[in-house]
Curated annotation (Swiss-Prot):
Topology class, membrane: Multi-pass membrane protein
Recorded superkingdom: Bacteria
Keyword Cell inner membrane set for record: yes
Name assigned to this protein: Probable succinate transporter subunit YjjB
Disulfide bond is among the record's keywords: no
Alphabetized UniProt keyword annotations: Cell inner membrane, Cell membrane, Membrane, Transmembrane, Transmembrane helix, Transport
Lineage: Bacteria, Pseudomonadati, Pseudomonadota, Gammaproteobacteria, Enterobacterales
Entry-linked PANTHER family: SUCCINATE TRANSPORTER SUBUNIT YJJB-RELATED, UPF0442 PROTEIN YJJB-RELATED
GO biological process: succinate transport
Main location (coarse class): membrane
Cellular component GO terms held in the UniProt record: plasma membrane
Similarity comment text for this entry: Belongs to the ThrE exporter (TC 2.A.79) family.
């Protein structure tokens, strides 16, 4: 893949991830003045995740680093725009939730329930369940760590 193709794919990924970020921000009743910032933050987070995954990182670490970026920028923007950081960050990380892994794990569990135990189906269930759980954990830890770092009252040393 050439650099132009990669940049076009990255831009497409960022634009397509900004749409659900704005949609969920509207569902969460985010003020209208914050909607473009939610879209931008969702695009930046998802773009960083895609960039890291194309560089060879796995999806869990890429998601963790992207949610760290989203949390850090959200805290800074909350200071500038006098809003709570969750206004920007929660809707921005929703496009990174592991829908396909969770769905595949759920379908595998239903198949095991109806058809009986089979080792390949159990491997599929456990693999996708652990992947989805790891991604959700990376999102939650990545969003909370910048707040712990930046709002710390004591010196770090």
């Amino acid at each position: 893949m050439g650099i132009i193709d990669f940049l076009l794919a990255l831009m497409q990924d960022m634009i397509l991830s900004a749409i659900p970020a704005v949609g969920f921000a509207m569902v969460f009743n985010v003020p209208h003045r914050a909607l473009p910032w939610c879209a931008l933050l969702g695009a930046l987070g998802h773009g960083l995740r895609m960039l890291m995954m194309s560089a060879g990182f796995n999806i869990e670490w890429s998601t963790f680093m992207a949610s760290l970026l989203v949390g850090s920028i959200g805290i800074q923007w909350s200071r500038w725009y006098l809003a709570h950081p969750k206004v920007f960050t929660v809707a921005a990380v929703i496009p990174m939730f592991p829908g396909i892994s969770a769905y595949t794990a759920m379908i595998s569990a239903v198949k095991i329930s109806h058809l009986g135990y089979s080792e390949p189906m159990m491997i599929t269930l456990l693999t996708n369940f652990l992947k989805a759980s790891s991604i959700v954990g990376a999102l939650s830890i990545g969003l909370s760590v910048p707040g712990l770092w930046l709002y710390r009252k004591r010196p770090r040393v």
